[in-house]
Amino acid sequence: MLSKYELIKPDIGSSHGNITKVYEIVGGKPLRGQVKVSGSKNAALPVLAASLLCKEPLQLTNLPKILDVTNMIQCMEALGKRFEFINTNTIKIGNREMDTLTIPKEAARQIRASIILLGPLVAQYPKVILPLPGGCSIGKRPIDLHISALNALGVDIVELPDCLVCSRRYARLQGNTINFSIKTVTGTENAMMAAVLAEGTTIINNAAMEPEIVDLANFLNRLGAKINGGGSDRITISGVDKLNSCGSYSIMADRIEAGTYLVAAAMTRGSISVKGVNPDYLVAVLSELKCAGAKITCDSDSIQLDMGEEYGESLNITTKPYPGFPTDLQSLFLSLTCVLRGNSYLCETLFEDRFQIVQELKKMGANISLKDNTAHIKGVSRLRGSQVNATDLRSGAALVCASLAAEGITQIFAIEHIERGYEDLILKLKALGANIKLIENTHVTSTELSDSHFKEATSSETRIQRASLIETIVTPSITTFGQFKRVPTGEVTELEKQQTPYLHHIM
């Protein structure tokens, strides 16, 4: 087997006993130069999942070299896919025969996006058992919307404490109308991937409108799907019998990574050009950067930012589904508002725990108070270096930006969160003039550095991971467990255990 997903596995920052990896950043130097954006994490993961629907070889290019992609590949290899890397960012995907399809539990529990394997799996197999996903600890991200959408297409689902047990009612999924009560990106993606092989027509109302949805629709249509309306709030899908190879497909650029470098340049009073990104996907973000004092100019595939010598006035931001301000950049702009003049307000409407970063920024001298889902920030003249912990992917990136602007030295721990979603972060920042390095074998434990807030965050993540210690199996038999309902483990019948051989291991 020529699969070498370790080629895209980055050096991750983690703690093993007394050995810790950290980012060390000396702040105060403006970022200047050009940076090219990598392929989008949030587009690559659903496109990889969608490749399960095609039994013919195909090739993906512009695949980001990040840990989430590595974990997704590990999951998909266990589901019968064969991966061969042509180069670091290009992968050839094929198939191999499998007697038992079992996802490695370690990979499944590390990645929130494992939930989007459900759509393509139930489209092809009569029964699927999927572990509840892991990922960043940023609050509740209920999967009820995924379940209700698949239920509408003919999937009966029982949610156990550790997994979902899914059974098709019919030999083939049935097209239907899906009405999402709120917008959900991964829920929309799951519904799309399931519906492309369903019998009849599926209409998704209140669909997510993100550019990554458009990218997935484009990929599926290249495979022979019939999807109309991707990028609007109403998507129509006419089911087909099978999908065929498109040859090669290029993953779209990462607009969140682009926003990250723009914020870093703004915070350091720098001047950079971000290449390879469509500025139309960042309209709300660029508007706020202009309000913060940045001069912005755009070409068709690049964005130039010049911050000048002075920070701008305060911001008032509310996160919203696309095309509104993205929640994935909320933490970054929280860092930015710490150094702006005046009082800023940041309201988070999508995730209740996006403010875990506040305690870390306070260590650096930030003046932030929280009330409900809103942060009130009073700008300070300068942040100062400290020892901080990345509690999730985007907060980690935000701490990097804050450290680049701070006076003195900052050490960032738990950098494995950052490496989940950023390709070659250190190399790209160094090319812009940043003083940043990875320090290994530092004999300091995270416990010695963390406060009670971080302990709660890490213990919460541990509980999430512990709850996901179950592998995923696809079995050949059809078993109906009834309509979706939550049931305690003890209510699963002996017959259901026998029909799903793996279930008895988790009872």
UniProtKB/Swiss-Prot annotation:
Q: Where in the cell is it found?
A: Cytoplasm
Q: Which pathway does it operate in? A: Cell wall biogenesis; peptidoglycan biosynthesis
- InterPro entries associated with the record: Enolpyruvate_Tfrase_dom (IPR001986), Enolpyruvate_Tfrase_sf (IPR036968), MurA_subfamily (IPR050068), RNA3'P_cycl/enolpyr_Trfase_a/b (IPR013792), UDP_GlcNAc_COvinyl_MurA (IPR005750)
Q: Which GO terms describe its cellular component?
A: cytoplasm
The family database entries (Pfam families) matched by this protein are listed as:
EPSP_synthase
Which residues are recorded as modified (2-(S-cysteinyl)pyruvic acid O-phosphothioketal)?
Answer: C136
Q: What is its main location?
A: cytoplasm
Concerning Gene3D superfamilies, the annotation shows: Enolpyruvate transferase domain
- Tell me yes or no: is Cytoplasm among this UniProt entry's keywords: yes
Query: Which chemical reaction does it catalyze?
Result: phosphoenolpyruvate + UDP-N-acetyl-alpha-D-glucosamine = UDP-N-acetyl-3-O-(1-carboxyvinyl)-alpha-D-glucosamine + phosphate
Q: Where is the active site?
A: C136 (proton donor)
Q: Which residues bind UDP-N-acetyl-alpha-D-glucosamine?
A: R112, R141, P142, I143, D144, L145, D328, L350
- Annotated keywords: Cell cycle, Cell division, Cell shape, Cell wall biogenesis/degradation, Cytoplasm, Peptidoglycan synthesis, Pyruvate, Transferase
Instruction: Enumerate the residues binding phosphoenolpyruvate.
Output: K41, N42
HAMAP family named among the record's database cross-references: MurA
The role this protein plays is: Cell wall formation. Adds enolpyruvyl to UDP-N-acetylglucosamine.
Entry similarity comment: Belongs to the EPSP synthase family. MurA subfamily.
PANTHER family from the xrefs?
Answer: UDP-N-ACETYLGLUCOSAMINE 1-CARBOXYVINYLTRANSFERASE (PTHR43783:SF1)
Q: Any idea what this protein is called?
A: UDP-N-acetylglucosamine 1-carboxyvinyltransferase 1
What is the protein's species of origin? Answer: Legionella pneumophila (strain Lens)
Which lineage ranks, top first, belong to the organism behind this chain?
Answer: Bacteria, Pseudomonadati, Pseudomonadota, Gammaproteobacteria, Legionellales
Q: Which gene encodes it?
A: murA1
